[in-house]
A protein has these predicted regions:
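Solvent-exposed, polar/charged alpha-helical surfaces in well-ordered, non-transmembrane soluble domains
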Residues: 71, 75, 89, 125, ...
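Pocket-lining segment of extracytoplasmic ligand-binding domains
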Residues: 86, 167-255
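Conserved C-terminal helix/tail region of periplasmic/extracytoplasmic solute-binding proteins
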Residues: 293-323
Length: 323
């Protein structure tokens, strides 16, 4: 089985690697591919889908966010990993040596604005003058800005309260914020615990695109580049398995992350779209550019930023053929 490394171990560069059994394909044979994973996700999914028989050595490093994955890539500690559209904007602004190589179709119904069950807030326009929690420099800040803009408001019209997810939950439960822009399993867990209401989801405000990125230097190595392409295809096939075995995956993932199975299964069934891996398109580049432009307006990154050079389309034909 693949070794799973901590972020600290990876950035220190001091970890051993385990070669996996060779598969039929020889893509990237003789090299080690270092892949980022989120808790309980990529390694377990690939294993369940029978996709871990890589012809190259494979190691996983566990990370809590895409921004940290970019940091690890820029430090030369990770070769490939996934993230939202937000980290590539900061990568472009900082000159980080990463490339966006594939587009992930993923759920946005799990990104919402919550309000307490008895709150008088009934529509996004009612957020004016209210204390609204969000996670700074993440999708929550982006879709909150877009939700406000759609009703003629901006961050200047609310009291924005940047909080970590854990601090946001505490503030929400204690009534210290009037609304909370949040994502992931914090949503159904908070709803189950307090009866909180979903004021609005990010569907229509987020593109539903996420990014698979690769270390620029890894792409310059023919064997590593081939291994990355093979890995992307395995991820794509694993997601197809997930859609066909949603209940099995709910059990596996629930056990791995310590979230009740019914909550995991409910979120999977409520997804805005099934997971898939697609080629980079002009529309996908434009979507990340829109994020960059919004974050420039919010003062989070200096402008101007052109995100187009961040994208590498070399795997487009490979991913399109496997559709």
């Amino acid at each position: 089985m693949p070794i799973i490394l901590s972020r600290r171990s990876l950035l220190a560069g001091g970890a051993g690697l385990l070669a996996l059994a060779p598969g039929l394909s020889q893509a990237g044979s003789g090299v080690t591919l270092r892949a980022a994973k989120y808790k309980g996700r990529e390694d377990n999914l690939l294993r369940a889908a029978g996709q871990l028989d890589t012809p190259y050595a494979l190691s996983f490093g566990e990370f809590a966010s895409g921004n940290v994955i970019v940091e690890a890539m820029n430090a030369g500690a990770i070769d490939v990993g996934s993230m939202s559209e937000i980290p590539p904007v900061f990568a472009a602004a900082s000159g980080a040596r990463i490339k966006a190589v594939a587009i992930i179709a993923d759920d946005v119904n799990n990104q919402v604005v919550l309000v307490p069950k008895d709150s008088p807030i009934r529509a996004p326009a009612d957020l004016a003058g209210k204390r609204v929690g969000y996670v700074r420099a993440t999708t929550t800040q982006y879709y909150l800005a877009r939700i406000l803009k759609a009703v003629g408001l901006s961050f200047a019209d609310i009291t924005g309260v940047p909080l970590t997810p854990a601090d946001g939950r505490a503030a929400f439960d204690q009534g210290a914020i009037d609304a909370w822009a949040i994502y992931g399993y914090s949503v159904p867990i908070t709803i189950a615990a307090s009866g909180a209401r979903v004021l609005v989801t990010a569907n229509g405000y987020l593109s539903g695109n996420y990014i698979y990125a690769a270390r620029a230097e890894a792409l310059e190595d023919p064997k590593l580049s081939a291994a990355i392409g093979d890995y992307l295809l395995r991820i794509k096939r694993a997601w197809a398995w997930q859609q066909a075995h949603i209940e099995d995956w709910a059990t596996i993932f629930s056990d791995a992350i310590g979230v009740p199975r019914d909550i995991v299964l409910g979120q999977l069934r409520n997804a805005s779209q099934p997971n898939d891996l697609k080629p980079v398109t002009d529309d996908a580049v434009a979507s990340v550019q829109a994020v960059a432009d919004t974050f420039i307006e919010l003062g989070l990154v200096p402008g101007p930023i052109d995100v187009a050079p961040l994208f590498d389309r070399r795997y487009g034909e490979l991913l399109a053929k496997s559709a």
